[in-house]
Amino acid sequence: MHVSLRQLRVFEAVARHNSYTRAAEELHLSQPAVSMQVRQLEDEIGLSLFERLGKQVVLTEAGREVFHYSRAIGQSLREMEEVLESLKGVSRGSLRIAVASTVNYFAPRLMAIFQQRHSGIGLRLDVTNRESLVQMLDSNSVDLVLMGVPPRNVEVEAEAFMDNPLVVIAPPDHPLAGERAISLARLAEETFVMREEGSGTRQAMERFFSERGQTIRHGMQMTRNEAVKQAVRSGLGLSVVSLHTIELELETRRLVTLDVEGFPDRRQWYLVYRRGKRLSPAAGAFREFVLSEAARMHCRLG
């Protein structure tokens, strides 16, 4: 049997996402190219690895076995790469960082400073929501993650590096703008523009109100922070966002923060990686950079 690593890599991505389309997006391939790699793997093995249930693809019994071994092979290859990178030293190497979409408001500046100090290290930055970040940690397919609350269902190391205050935003002409000490009960009468399911900000927002016995009214749902802010500016509802995402809007008075009981909700950003993972010199250098530069970086962002 002649199975290629490329075939296994493509198969593993399809199996993780239960989708050829999402696998193609992750791997930066066309969907026909992904389908061809899976088909060639099935031909080599002599068994079907997926079956269709409606619009979703699911693993067959043979597919589940191949998925188990493909992940083990992938893990061994990543460990080999890390060992080889360690032999090169911190002046060289590659680094894959994944960040929550809200972190992306300061991540490029963070990466630029790090790149100036370590120009020989190649950086790849993935920006996605919390659900996808947890999947990346679970599959150990990323070196380091910058995110909000670390997952509980994956064994990870998590180190706080910056405050992440969540605030309630409204357009400047909203009736609650300028009011003091707004109660949560009063706020619950308003409609809220929501991030999508799987968003860390949405989960934090819903948890905050639930823990205080309040239910919020869901309005429009958006997959991007910029869309959420635009919807709030247009009067479609209030929202809860990270203070880091509205620096420009506050300066220009396009949005205002409301003085609400319990807000700002003081949270933190974390640097997260799989427990027991041997960090490459490049990953170790980035970790030390983030933790040591956090206070200075916070001042820049402020």
Curated annotation (Swiss-Prot):
It comes from the Bacteria. The keyword Translocase does not apply. Residues 20-39 bind DNA. It holds the Pfam family HTH_1. One of its GO terms (molecular function) is transcription cis-regulatory region binding. The keyword Cell membrane does not apply. Residues 1-60 form the HTH lysR-type domain. Keywords: Activator, DNA-binding, Transcription, Transcription regulation. Belongs to the LysR transcriptional regulatory family. Trans-acting transcriptional regulator of RuBisCO genes (rbcAB) expression. This is RuBisCO operon transcriptional regulator. It comes from Allochromatium vinosum.
